[in-house]
Amino acid sequence: MDLPSHSINAMKSMEVIDINTGTKLGLIKDLKIDTEEYKVISIILPGSKVGGWFSKGNDIEIDWTDIQKIGVDVILVNGDNLFVNKD
């Protein structure tokens, strides 16, 4: 059985949507990868920039297990466990 696969570049152009609220969360900015297990741990989305043009936004981290479905042009996630990274 062939599993569907997507390139990182293709995934970065897919809209990420919370299935609970229907909210568009944005596009993938980065991936967090476990280099020992060769697995994706989470996806990182750019957060909203509060405070003006030059302010740093808080990134949103979504655990890979919270991804419900990867389609042709959209990624559906369970947004109950969103983590906002305030680095």
Curated annotation (Swiss-Prot):
InterPro entries listed in its UniProt record: PRC-brl_dom, PRC_barrel-like_sf, Spore_YlmC/YmxH
SUPFAM superfamilies assigned to the protein according to its UniProt record, in alphabetical order: PRC-barrel domain
Top-rank taxon: Bacteria
Family as reported in the entry's similarity comment: Belongs to the YlmC/YmxH family.
Entry protein name: Uncharacterized protein CA_C1697
Organism name: Clostridium acetobutylicum (strain ATCC 824 / DSM 792 / JCM 1419 / IAM 19013 / LMG 5710 / NBRC 13948 / NRRL B-527 / VKM B-1787 / 2291 / W)
